[in-house]
């Protein structure tokens, strides 16, 4: 008996595509007269996630008008909650159950649905960020530092683009590191895989243990691991780049908010770690579960790429706070 996950394409409709581009986790359940099993699939492909983000950004530009920063925050929460609820409703109506048979050899019942809670959170985050980015004007930057999410997003965006450019430049000369990281099967789609790889390397640049392909990257793996010297040098260089950007950011925060009585570094570190965690959550690729009896040609076992959400949140917060504090303190020596 054989069953290929690719056969599910026959049951996909436009509602499933909408949920898929919002990076929801699909739960697949299959059963026969003799056994049953389930698989969870989360494909956190960032390029796909940009589709709803750009659509929400465009709608925010057209429809949302704000007069003050407080209205912007309320609108952002409202749009995020509404978009998340819409995805939940779509998910409820898109749950699918089907039967697959192969002459008289076997009967297979298949059902799949998206994770409702995750879809709501994804929708809320996408709706909130897109509305907030469009509505938050520079003239409010110094008025309410507790809403200073945009500065953290800009810092992470600079780091992401820098990491992507570094990876792209190295790949043009020699893409051997892709083979070393276990990504050789994707070397033909260099731009696509690098956009995904950059998010993993960015998490690692914040000292977060990260799984990439067949490798578990951490500070200890660079020191004692079996990676080639060139690959280790690349990873160390990106870590130093992260250090430099955060030190400069801390330095600029001191100059910008030198008269503020609030703990600017703490507030920024919280925003920074939350956004890094969101990026990590959206970029995780996971296939896992148990399908006994079924010989599924496209299912090779548990696969995980990315970093743990809780680990990312804690480590990136501690790391960013320490490095930002260094940059913040350096301005005192002027």
Label each residue range with its predicted role:
Residues 1-53, 93-116, 168-238, 278-321, ...:
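Long, glycine/tryptophan/cysteine-rich extracytoplasmic
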Residues 150-151, 155-164, 223-242:
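Surface-exposed interaction/gating patches
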Residues 237-244, 262-275:
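C-terminal substrate/ligand-recognition segments
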Residues 50-60, 64-65, 72, 79-93:
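Small-residue-rich
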Residues 80-90, 160, 164-165, 271-279:
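Aromatic-anchored segments of alpha-helical transmembrane domains
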Residues 71-74, 94-125, 130-158:
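Membrane-interface helix-loop-helix junctions at boundaries between adjacent transmembrane segments
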Residues 38-68, 122-142, 230-258, 317-334:
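Transmembrane alpha-helical segments in integral membrane proteins
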Residues 1, 67-81, 145-163, 258-270:
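Alpha-helical transmembrane segments and their helix-start/interface "positive-inside/aromatic belt" motifs
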């Amino acid at each position: 008996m054989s069953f290929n996950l690719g056969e599910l394409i026959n049951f996909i409709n436009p509602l499933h595509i909408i949920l898929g581009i919002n990076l929801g986790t699909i739960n697949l359940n299959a059963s026969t007269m003799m056994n049953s099993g389930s698989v969870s699939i989360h494909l956190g492909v960032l390029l796909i996630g940009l589709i709803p983000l750009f659509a929400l950004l465009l709608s925010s530009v057209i429809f949302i008008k704000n007069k003050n920063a407080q209205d912007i925050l309320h609108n952002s929460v409202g749009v995020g909650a509404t978009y998340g609820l819409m995805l939940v409703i779509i998910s409820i109506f898109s749950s699918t159950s089907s039967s697959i048979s192969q002459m008289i050899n076997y009967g297979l019942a298949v059902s799949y649905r998206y994770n409702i809670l995750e879809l709501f959170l994804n929708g809320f985050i996408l709706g909130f960020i897109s509305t907030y980015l469009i509505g938050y004007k520079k003239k409010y930057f110094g008025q309410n530092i507790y809403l200073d999410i945009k500065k953290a997003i800009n810092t992470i965006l600079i780091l992401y683009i820098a990491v992507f450019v570094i990876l792209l430049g190295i790949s043009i000369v020699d893409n051997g590191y892709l083979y070393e990281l276990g990504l050789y099967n994707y070397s033909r789609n260099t731009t696509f895989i690098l956009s995904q790889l950059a998010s993993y390397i960015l998490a690692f640049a914040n000292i977060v243990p990260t799984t990439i392909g067949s490798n578990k990257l951490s500070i200890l793996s660079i020191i004692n691991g079996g990676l080639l010297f060139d690959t280790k040098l690349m990873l160390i260089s990106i870590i130093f780049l992260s250090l430099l950007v955060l030190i400069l950011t801390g330095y600029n925060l001191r100059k910008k908010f030198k008269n503020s009585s609030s703990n600017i570094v703490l507030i920024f570190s919280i925003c920074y770690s939350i956004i890094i965690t969101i990026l990590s959550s959206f970029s995780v690729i996971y296939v896992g579960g148990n399908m006994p009896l079924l010989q599924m040609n496209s299912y090779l076992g548990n696969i995980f790429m990315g970093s743990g959400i809780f680990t990312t949140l804690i480590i990136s917060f501690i790391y960013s706070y320490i490095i930002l504090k260094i940059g913040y303190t350096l301005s005192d020596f002027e």
